[in-house]
């Protein structure tokens, strides 16, 4: 496994980040522990979760359970593992029935951090990420709460998730004025089929020195070789079948290119991300040990300039005309 700095920090993380959104939901605790064991053995030292993970992932989710954090916490208790990993979690989502049980008020940040530490059975979080932007809370309040956690040793670094480019700029401007390090990483939806962040978020990350952690690198499985795989699980749903038909011409060209390269579609999709200098580590979310093992090979794949150009032709970037394409 190769390692790189997380953004402009001195912290070294693996080129793949293990996402645990499925832990406690579609993946039971025993399998989750096996995935964590296999990841650590393979050299993955970057593990990402969130307080809300472990609940059934659906658009109408009402309240998080913290189950994913609890599973990781019980795994960490088995000795010697905490010192070998970089542990990241998130704050923002609804975690209780009260009016202050969500978002990024100082009240909720303090309580959410304490709850995450308890569930994770650790005394500190390495990277504490804001899961979404909160337009109801001033940045001065957010940073004051985060600075206190850092001063107390409960958090080492702060990251963001699903931020727009101008949100990153605003956050960093306020942090700089307070003589605070500010954001060190951003998690964004980014893959060959979803390249909108190339307009503003990636330039913002490059400018401010944030590491980029792309989530959904395989577009929910769409880039995993769906045309030649038997439909199962999420791929068997009618909505996913319609998505395949919508992208069938591109998928046929893409999977044909991967076959010519002698690489799997999922490995090519991950390798494409890894060759972007702003990308720190794609966020992989294996549901099984076998899926994790398949993803590891991607770190050894190098795509030629011609292949990168072919991928751009199949899956074009956002493009556009000013000011939309040059808003940063």
Predicted regions and their residues:
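A short acidic, helix-capping loop that chelates divalent metal ions and anchors anionic groups
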Residues: 53-59, 94-100, 291
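Aromatic-lined glycan-binding groove of carbohydrate-active enzymes
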Residues: 196-233, 264
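Conserved, mostly hydrophobic/aromatic
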Residues: 6, 18, 32, 47, ...
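N-terminal small/glycine-rich loop or linker at the start of catalytic domains
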Residues: 7-26, 88-101, 124, 129
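N-terminal binding-site loop/beta-alpha segment at the start of enzyme catalytic domains
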Residues: 1-84, 151
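Terminal-tail/helix-coil boundary detector
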Residues: 207, 231-256, 260-261, 275-279, ...
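Short, well-ordered coil/turn segments that N-cap beta-strands
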Residues: 11-16, 43-45, 81-85, 122-126, ...
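Glycine/proline-rich, positively charged
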Residues: 93-193, 200
